Amino acid sequence: MRAVELLLLLGLASMVHGLCSPTVFYRDCWIRRFPGMLLDLEESQRLGAQFLKYYSENTGQKCGRSCCLRKDVSCNVAVFFHDPVHDNVNCLHVHCPTLESCILEPGASAILYNITAGIDPDLLVFEHTSPIYPNSRSSSEWWDRLRILKAMSVGSEGVYPDVMNRMVPSTEAASTTQQDLGANTGISYSRKSTTDVGLRFTSANVSTATKVNMVSPSTDFTHSPGNKTISPFFGPTDTRVSQVPSRSRLNISKPSVNKTKGSHSRNHSSENEEPWDGAPASAGVWLACVTLGAAVISLCCRVVLGTSRCCGKRQGWSHMGQRSASGCRRNTLKENS
């Protein structure tokens, strides 16, 4: 019995762990965790990664949040080691300017945290602000591919860089700088920003992010054919240009844009669908009421018929008893006479 209970508890824990989202929001930062992954620090430093801090922390959550709270430098990667190599030093902070500068490898006793700037989801819902971070599902798919390829190349050395070179897009389109993003507008601005967002690991300058937010996009930019945002390899970034302009910027009427629905193609049918949604429910209620009433009426009729039959039978037996008694009296009188 104890073994069965233990198995049930383990299964419940695995289900709860699967339901938990790997991405959380904390202090204007999106923190995405990748269990079983760590960073090859030496190789990453050769490719341009910057070592920031290596210290002791209580939990992996605090390690990732402390990387988010760093204001002196831009910290976008944190690695927490459950089994520290050195004296209780288990938290590593690194800044990776590009995707190619971070070389990852599997590690059973480590958790990698990707920290990117973002907007509070409550503000996105109640203030109708367009999302700046991309879909996390595409990022998780890239990471699943990375884990599979890395697991295949664990036994041999020198295979992982080749896999990364085939898997990661080229860095030629990443030549656009943060200042170009803040200065350009229109269609040319959209093409540069989307390609740069797709290849950068995170944004390294907060001032340029404010410049991007201050630029008001035009209608031509919103409907331009080249405005296709490429999902980054890691989590959300803070410089992605909004695909749907806000209501305060372009002054669009309500029937054309309905941001609470989440899809532009469903706006024309959202108001007409409400009566149809309530009709089946009301019909079901009426049908249940009619069926219940018919059942009650039939039950009452059966009860009345049953009681009437019982009363008739009792009256018949009483009449027969009276007749037999009167016949017996007559016979006795005749015999006595």
From Swiss-Prot:
It comes from the Eukaryota. It is a single-pass type I membrane protein. Glycans are attached at residues 114, 227, 251. Residues 1-18 form the signal peptide. Residues 33-113 form the MANSC domain. One of its GO terms (cellular component) is membrane. It is found in: Membrane. Pfam families: MANEC (PF07502). Residues 19-278 are extracellular. Keywords: Glycoprotein, Membrane, Signal, Transmembrane, Transmembrane helix. Residues 216-277, 314-337 are annotated as: Disordered. The chain crosses the membrane at residues 279-299. Residues 216-230, 239-260 have a biased composition (Polar residues). Residues 300-337 are cytoplasmic. The keyword Glycoprotein applies. This is MANSC domain-containing protein 4. It comes from Mus musculus. The gene is Mansc4.
